[in-house]
Amino acid sequence: MFTCKVNEHITIRLLEPKDAERLAELIIQNQQRLGKWLFFAENPSSADTYRETIIPDWRRQYADLNGIEAGLLYDGSLCGMISLHNLDQVNRKAEIGYWIAKEFEGKGIITAACRKLITYAFEELELNRVAICAAVGNEKSRAVPERIGFLEEGKARDGLYVNGMHHDLVYYSLLKREWEGEK
């Protein structure tokens, strides 16, 4: 199954049922922060639901070549997630999503993991385009694609509905030729 070493501290890997307790715990601990922008944090699933349903679904999704929902590990400890979703192999494109627990912010984990997943998308999956979208008000999430060199394409007005509120989304993209030019 999918495991990708980013550097000596960071690993991206598919979650296993044994990760369910830690995942549920992280989401609950960060619920107020994550719930502003991510629907799943509004009413977090239980560890049992992650173990019995959600994690097995994510593993099937990967096996069926429909995307990657993976854990982010820092020094072996689960600290967040990263995904390659809306995978469209016909048009050779996908989107990246991510979140991280507050205690792990500021260590460059998300940026490094995104760079690794982008390389994987372009080199292994032979995609041509990777996109990231973030709520206009989610400055920390928006900083990631801006730091990496994504191009801001535009906004989707009221493109996100979470916590009973609509939020505008900013869309960013990076093309394979741009990524190769950065190296």
Curated annotation (Swiss-Prot):
Q: Per the similarity annotation, which family is this?
A: Belongs to the acetyltransferase family.
Q: Residues in domain N-acetyltransferase?
A: 10-176
**GO terms assigned for molecular function:** protein N-terminal-serine acetyltransferase activity; protein-N-terminal-alanine acetyltransferase activity
Q: What is the lineage of its organism?
A: Bacteria, Bacillati, Bacillota, Bacilli, Bacillales
Instruction: List the keywords (alphabetical).
Output: Acyltransferase, Transferase
Native organism = Bacillus subtilis (strain 168)
Q: What does this protein do?
A: Putative N-acetyltransferase. May act on ribosomal proteins (Potential).
Q: Which Pfam families match?
A: Acetyltransf_3
Q: CDD domains given for it?
A: NAT_SF
Q: Which domain of life is it from?
A: Bacteria
Q: What is its EC number?
A: 2.3.1.-
What GO CC terms are in its UniProt record?
cytoplasm
What assembly does the database describe for this protein? Answer: Homohexamer, and homodimer.
Q: Key word Acyltransferase present in the record?
A: yes
Protein name per Swiss-Prot or TrEMBL = Putative ribosomal N-acetyltransferase YdaF
Q: Which InterPro entries match?
A: Acyl_CoA_acyltransferase (IPR016181), GNAT_dom (IPR000182), Ribosomal_N-acetyltransferase (IPR051908)
